[in-house]
Design a protein with these regions (language model features):
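A short, well-ordered alpha-helix in the C-terminal region of glycosyltransferases
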Residues: 308, 322-336
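Aromatic "clamp/platform" in nucleotide-sugar-dependent glycosyltransferases that forms part
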Residues: 228
């Protein structure tokens, strides 16, 4: 999603300014490299790598090697941090021939979430036949597991007047891609000609205001994801801070913001799930998902259990008012604990810069 707004223009200006400075022989005191770890380089006295991390349970060997070029690393979830902190390999020093049995990232890794953003709502006109509809926002890919997401929905609601709005694309938001995506969806639904439930394809560019309108549409009752893994899960985060009930596996990046403190009967406060959990198994990623240097064949991610997924859909359908109440509590928690000023302060401190209360007043916050 690309938008020509103040924040985008500010980033473009800084990128252009930085490029011109480097071309003229300028030297940097510190580099913040926002890219995939394969591209990290030592280009300044202090170098900080910033990445979304990984959707599986371990990072690639090349990432471990490149992490040594950084002084600090910042990621966007505890799941991504776990991958950097706990992945180990057996390696050989190419210069000495020494075998390293515990080759790992030794650089400090900090997790800093995306911030909550207040976005004005723009009404989205959807021609939905039923009052109860689920929403899924994901690119059509192996990792997002859309085939099983759609198939499980249809199997569960083939005799019910329920809808699934699928905001998706295969590669981009072009007209050609829309035809390709529509064709894939039609083929997936062919075995169910007599179903009562309906699946709607929503394709194309949408602004942040329109997406907010989608999350707050009166006929959209919950967001569902059966993805194998997330580095963070931005659409899930957006849905949650808009007060939309969420159905998701209890694994990977999105669990950071789907839990909130809750008092038990004894008055003890514990972090509790504020979403409907899908049971899963951890297993090696599919061969079609292997990405050399990024997603290793021996890495694992979650495989949502289909029956658990379908029963989770049914739970929300049968008791949407209760789950909406839980979602509203999570919304308040996110808006407070993931507020922009808190996240920006945490991000700056992750770079080794101490931020006092007076300094935070000068932070530029893009709403």
């Amino acid at each position: 999603m690309f938008e020509d707004n103040e924040e985008r223009r500010w980033f473009d200006f800084l990128a252009k300014k930085t490029g011109m400075y480097a071309q003229n022989g300028g030297q940097f005191d510190m580099s913040l490299q926002v890219t995939i770890p394969n591209e990290w380089e030592k280009i300044a006295p202090v170098n900080i790598g910033y990445t979304a991390g990984i959707e599986t349970d371990k990072i690639a060997p090349g990432w471990v090697e490149r992490s040594a070029l950084m002084d600090r690393i910042t990621v966007i979830s505890e799941h991504a941090k776990y991958g950097f902190d706990n992945t180990t390999y057996e390696a050989t020093n190419q210069q000495t021939g020494e075998v390293i049995p515990d080759f790992r990232c030794t650089v400090p890794v900090t997790s800093v979430s995306y911030p909550y953003k207040h976005i004005e709502t723009q009404e989205v006109s959807l021609n939905l036949d039923f009052d109860f509809n689920f929403l899924c926002v994901a690119q059509w890919s192996v990792r997002k597991n859309l085939e099983n997401t759609v198939r499980g929905f249809v199997e569960e609601f083939k005799n019910d007047e329920v809808g699934l709005v699928l905001k998706t694309s295969c590669r981009n938001n072009s007209v050609i891609d829309r035809a390709m995506t529509n064709n894939q969806l039609e083929n997936l639904l062919k075995p169910y000609p007599d179903r009562k439930c309906k699946v709607y394809l929503l394709h194309g560019d949408m602004t942040e205001e329109e997406m907010t309108g989608l999350y707050n549409h009166p006929k959209i009752k919950g967001l569902v994801t059966a993805a194998h893994g997330e580095g963070f899960g931005l659409p899930i985060f957006e849905a949650a801070y808009n007060g939309l009930p969420v159905i998701a596996p209890d694994w990977s990046g999105h669990v950071d913001f789907l839990y909130a403190p809750k008092k038990d009967k004894k008055g003890n406060v514990k972090n509790k799930p504020h979403f409907i959990k899908i049971d899963y198994d951890l297993a090696p990623i599919q061969q079609t998902a292997v990405w050399d240097g990024v997603l290793n064949a021996d890495s694992r991610w979650c495989y949502p259990k289909q029956q658990s997924y379908q029963s989770s859909l049914r739970k929300l359908y049968k008791d949407s008012k209760m789950y909406k109440g839980i979602a509203n509590k999570l919304q308040k928690h996110i808006q407070t604990e993931f507020a922009a000023d808190k996240m920006y302060k945490k991000f700056v401190e992750a770079m080794g810069v101490k931020v006092d209360e007076d300094t935070t007043e000068d932070l530029v916050v893009f709403d």
